[in-house]
Amino acid sequence: YRHRRKNSERKAGNISDWVMRWGGGYEAMLVLDADSIMSGSIMVEMARRLEAEPGLGLLQTLPNIVLSESLYGRLQQFANRLYGPVFANGLAAWHGYGSNFWGHNAIIRTRAFADSAHLPVLSGKPPFGGHVISHDFIEAALLRRAGWGVRFDTDLEQSYEEAPPSMSDVLIRDRRWCQGNLQHSRFLFARGLALTNRLHILSGIMAYASALFWFMLLAVGMVLTIQASFTPTDYFPEFSLFPSWPVFDSERAITLFVQSMAIVLLPKFLAWVTGILNLRRCLGYGGPLLLTISVLVEVVLSAMFAPVMMLAQSQMVREILTGSDSGWKPQRRNDG
């Protein structure tokens, strides 16, 4: 499929071409990326579950990152393996039959996909028009709109993928994902979509737009701080025997900080607890002490990387809003 006669729509075009040419002969199709793989036993189990539920249109697994060797890659792999199940089980419980599609490591009922998941060509030019770049969210939404179930089964292990080995490689991929997610705004108010799918789309948009909001918040805070340092404090703005002292609401500031940290760190804490309590998993990380040290190192490094990602993603959003198209750049898939 790298050499289709009409090589359009990239990965979505590969799937569409296969469905039109060969899909009629197969009850289901298993979608993988170039850097993902699954065990034979899991493939058989996925096919069994799909066959057992006639109303199920798509079954998504949780891919585990493997084969990372660089520091950044190992950081992603550790976070994926330890924190991933906590997030995944929460998402699966919340989504139910209205889950999402991640584009790979999933099995799809061919007839359901062919009948209901054809992607439109959006009016206008890229980055918001043209072919849909990030096809997976929209295909899941279209399947759900047609009445098919989309489910995320987190108990299906031996589902694997590789991750970009460096931050620069992640940012190259993020530029395309950012454009695809912002392009999804064209579908946010489409007729017939389920509420959960609209929330999937909105959360995907906010995954990148929030970086710009964070940057703007910091910029406004910096401007206000500079302004305050150059503005004399007026202790007597009106006639009074007593001065009017500046008010700083430290209690609310601390509350906001604690709540923000809880949102960021609580899932990681829960994952650490489950890792400690599961003896087999804990020993796989080298025991309780090494697991705890690894979590602390990951938290510190993630906090160091976060401002860099914020600036880069803010730039991505700005470029897209001003009409810059990312195209589809090749991705480095090894640590060399």
Task: Locate predicted features.
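Basic/Trp-rich segment in TM-proximal cytosolic loops or flexible interdomain/linker regions
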Residues: G96, A163-G336
